[in-house]
Amino acid sequence: MEDSFAPDNVRSRLLFSGLKELETHGVSDFSLRRVAQDAGVSCAAPYRHFKDKDELIGAVIGFVIEGWTLLSEQISGIFSSDSRSLVIELAVAGLRFWIANGNFRTVISASQTLDKAPLSAFEKPITDAAKRYMSDNGASYSDTLSFKLLSMIYGAVILVDGGYESAERAAESLRCVLSSEL
């Protein structure tokens, strides 16, 4: 069944299927058999790429974090000379990333039982931008700004999930609030 696919392609399909499995069934009911079936490979295929389900879950978490890292690095490069815009755009991108990747929340929740690294990887670019913004404006950094930024992002995600706000309106509202506050 999987012979027509390159090994890297099979691994990628297993990661995508693992992400869907986490979103649908969570960590406690995670099934390598369902992942293999969804990826269109044999039940033995996951074991050729991952030692066990924990290793696959860890790889899925790494895959999601890598997506955010690439996005945040691109934004940091674009707004490298304007720390205010950098804070705003990273916060809006973070919100859009969480909304567009509902499975990211599942992965983060799942990973909290493993370690805090995935959540830290999401928060670090935003916190670093807040530190730089404070420094550029002659203020000493306190974690209050980061707390406010992250609270607004997480709160907006909850509002969108609850149907109180559309994703686009939440992103624009966040941008508007940050533009007036910074």
Residues of each region from the PLM?
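Short hydrophobic/aromatic patch on the recognition helix
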Residues: A39-F50
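Hydrophobic alpha-helical connector segments
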Residues: A59, E73-N103, L149
